[in-house]
């Protein structure tokens, strides 16, 4: 069992080194029966202003647009259809950003509204544009307030929930810490709604099956993400080398306590070395378009020696994909090794599989590259959150 002093040291180290922070605020924190809870927003903005005084940069990922719209329109329950939800978001988004603007104006801080769909991050050019815009806003001392563009989004381009979006924004901005504020005190060792003796787990060093079992998917009446979705977000960011803390946004001074290194919430420590921004994009933003099956030698070269994938080690493939597409690399037992961007299309790879690189031009009449996947464009499975999309 990890001692209290060691946990305190870990928390202090994480807090002290967090110069750029993404703070995700859930609907259960921001909204009440009367709509957006201005008292909560004012309190959080007060705490965030103190973080700014400490020299930290802050990005907010804010839920609450749909919930705010529901209250403003006078609906008694969550809309059932997509058009109704999108209309509620259109009504509520203005109220939400206005609340942030007014709250931060007391501290002479400015905000900028950023609305995204997953399409904006899947496309590499748009991903870089979003990254550069966020970086510029932070350089100007402005606090970006990010949300999914619920008004126009469809299922095919949804992030799923703002927990997932916050993980992607933490990677996009190369943040030092992701803080997820919810109406729970952290990750419990059992469901606190059912077990009176349930206690918060102070620190998680590795998200394994036991930890996953602690998470009960119990979204609030207004939100879409429960503890399971927060755990998936934690897996994404910690796999990329970024710590995450889940804390109770309804508690006064929760951010002050977190950044003072106090034992509040659950701290998820990084599971590996920090990935480059591009590798984070490959690992957690893109959806694989096909599979490449490798022989034992190629699989070992990718997994253990950090080599690029050459055509000679390919024994099969599945799917239709073009140059630059993300594909999964599997060993000959169909186990996922990782994901990479291909320098050749599926049709081209089918023609050159199993042959040496010096024969590619003879077969195709041209050669894009010696490598089918360059090691700089490949991410091992261990650095990828193991969700259904990738495995």
What are the functions of these language-model segments?
Residues 2-77, 82-110, 114-391:
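C-terminal catalytic "cap/lid" subdomain
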């Amino acid at each position: 069992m990890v001692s209290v002093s060691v946990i305190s040291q870990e928390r202090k180290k994480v807090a002290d080194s967090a110069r750029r922070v993404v703070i995700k605020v859930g609907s259960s924190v921001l909204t009440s029966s009367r709509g957006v809870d201005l008292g909560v927003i004012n309190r959080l903005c007060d705490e965030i202003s103190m973080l700014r005084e400490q020299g930290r940069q802050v990005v907010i990922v804010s839920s609450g647009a749909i919930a705010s719209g529901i209250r403003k329109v006078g609906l008694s329950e969550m809309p059932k259809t997509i058009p109704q939800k999108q209309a509620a978001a259109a009504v509520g988004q203005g109220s939400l950003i206005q609340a942030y603007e007014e709250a931060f104006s007391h501290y002479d801080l400015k905000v900028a509204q950023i609305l995204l769909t997953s399409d904006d991050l899947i496309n590499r050019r748009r991903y870089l544009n979003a990254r550069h815009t966020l970086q510029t806003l932070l350089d100007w001392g402005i606090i970006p307030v990010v949300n999914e563009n619920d008004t126009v989004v469809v299922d095919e381009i949804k992030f799923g929930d703002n927990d997932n979006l916050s993980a992607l924004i933490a990677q996009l901005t190369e943040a030092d810490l992701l803080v997820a504020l919810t109406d729970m005190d952290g990750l419990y060792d059992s469901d606190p709604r059912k077990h009176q003796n349930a206690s918060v787990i102070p620190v998680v060093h590795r998200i394994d099956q036991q930890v996953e079992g602690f998470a009960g998917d119990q979204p609030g009446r207004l939100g879409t993400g429960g503890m399971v979705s927060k755990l998936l977000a934690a897996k994404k960011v910690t796999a990329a080398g970024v710590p995450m803390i889940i804390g109770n946004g309804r508690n006064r001074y929760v951010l002050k306590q977190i950044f003072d290194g106090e034992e509040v919430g659950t701290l998820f420590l990084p599971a590996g070395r920090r990935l480059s921004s591009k590798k984070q994009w490959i690992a957690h933003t893109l959806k694989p378009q096909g599979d490449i099956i490798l022989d034992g030698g190629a699989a070992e070269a990718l997994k253990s020696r950090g080599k690029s994938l050459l055509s000679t080690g390919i024994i099969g493939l599945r799917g239709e994909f073009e140059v630059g597409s993300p594909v999964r690399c599997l060993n000959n037992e169909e186990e996922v090794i990782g994901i990479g961007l291909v320098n050749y299309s599926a049709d081209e790879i089918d023609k050159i599989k199993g042959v040496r690189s010096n024969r590619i031009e003879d077969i195709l009449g041209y050669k894009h590259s010696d490598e089918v996947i360059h090691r700089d464009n490949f991410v091992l499975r261990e650095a990828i959150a193991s969700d259904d999309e990738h495995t």
